[in-house]
A protein has these predicted regions:
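Phosphate- and divalent-cation-binding pockets in alpha/beta enzyme and binding domains
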Residues: 47, 69-72, 101, 206-210
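Helical "lid/coupling" subdomains associated with nucleotide-phosphate turnover
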Residues: 150-212
Length: 212
């Protein structure tokens, strides 16, 4: 079944795909198990590995980014109390320059993970368009004086509206991930009880609080 899925996606993309899969520990409401399938463009992955080897770094194995952030969470986070009668749903989100990696953890078990094309560049683009500036200039303004919270120290008020627009898009994508995650995992998810943010994009002033 996994081979068919990989071949189907590869045919649509017209590219050779590196792939792997794992069965998730959480049991679906119908008693079945969910299989998480990871895909990557083989050409792009090979280029990265070759560049690392050129610097003397040998990579034993590659891990999809959403699983990597779950691994980081599992290593350093406070785990849910499984004796508690209440469910614990953690939303993990890593916002990079051009990617958003999301994982959902229900009662310490991974139930969903995915990567989408959205990142800090979208915030910079929104700011550049609103200010009529070049991307490089907007990036500097975003890092030094940008923010989504009115009255915040060091935030230029002119940056708030465009950056908040991008933040609204990000919030919508996270909410969508929760809906899709519950559907694909085949479980009824409770409300999010904890948020775990990482990535350079999350350093924008006021963004974590806005998303909360």
């Amino acid at each position: 079944i996994m081979k068919y899925e990989v071949e189907s996606v590869a045919d649509r993309m017209g590219e050779v795909l590196a792939h792997d899969f794992k069965q998730l520990p959480a049991v679906r409401d119908d008693g079945e198990r969910t299989v998480l399938l990871g895909l990557a463009r083989e050409e792009g992955l090979s280029a990265i590995l070759e560049a690392l080897e050129g610097e003397g770094i040998l990579v034993a194995s590659s891990v999809p980014a959403p699983l990597a952030i779950y691994g980081a969470w599992e290593l350093v986070s406070t785990k849910a109390d499984l004796d508690s009668p209440d469910d614990d749903l953690v939303l993990i989100a890593d916002l990079g320059r051009s990617s958003l990696d999301v994982a959902l953890v229900l009662n310490n078990r991974l139930v969903f993970a995915r990567s989408t094309t959205f990142g800090g560049d979208q915030f910079t683009e929104a700011l550049a368009q609103d200010l009529g500036a070049e991307m490089g200039q907007a990036e500097v303004v975003k890092k030094q004086r940008g923010g989504v919270t009115e009255g915040a120290k060091g935030v230029d008020e002119r940056t708030i509206r465009p950056l908040r627009t991008a933040a609204g898009q990000l919030l919508g994508m996270l909410e969508s991930s929760i809906r899709v995650g519950g559907s694909q995992a085949g479980v009824k998810l409770p409300g999010v009880t904890r948020l775990w943010f990482s990535g350079g994009g999350m350093r924008l002033k006021g963004l974590p609080r806005y998303l909360s």
